[in-house]
Amino acid sequence: MIRKAFVMQVNPDAHEEYQRRHNPIWPELEAVLKSHGAHNYAIYLDKARNLLFATIEIESEERWNAVASTDVCQRWWKYMIDVMPANADNSPVSSELQEVFYLP
């Protein structure tokens, strides 16, 4: 299993809306994530800095990257662009984090 972590941003006035949209996520999005080998996906909100910290375990980089090309992911990104900064393809602006410590 590959552990990943990344940081995204949320608009300052959209904390509650971001949480509402994720509680729960669309069932079809959950199904796509699971079918592409995603496990233990969690997102944490730093309200003071408007940051989202995400962790996930994936089975392979290829399967994880393939999620982006699915119809449901494309629709989700479009749904979220009013609550967080997005790239030109509507994907969330994000930065992958380097793991520096892990205690199994």
Swiss-Prot record:
One of its GO terms (biological process) is rhamnose catabolic process. Its EC number is 5.1.3.32. GO terms for molecular function: L-rhamnose mutarotase activity. One of its GO terms (cellular component) is cytoplasm. It catalyses: alpha-L-rhamnose = beta-L-rhamnose. Pfam families: rhaM (PF05336). Substrate binds at Y18, Y41, W76, W77. InterPro entries: Dimeric_a/b-barrel (IPR011008), L-rhamnose_mutarotase (IPR013448), Rham/fucose_mutarotase (IPR008000). The keyword Transferase does not apply. It is an enzyme of class 5 (isomerase). The active site is at H22 (proton donor). Involved in the anomeric conversion of L-rhamnose. This is L-rhamnose mutarotase. It comes from Escherichia coli O127:H6 (strain E2348/69 / EPEC). The lineage of its organism: Bacteria, Pseudomonadati, Pseudomonadota, Gammaproteobacteria, Enterobacterales.
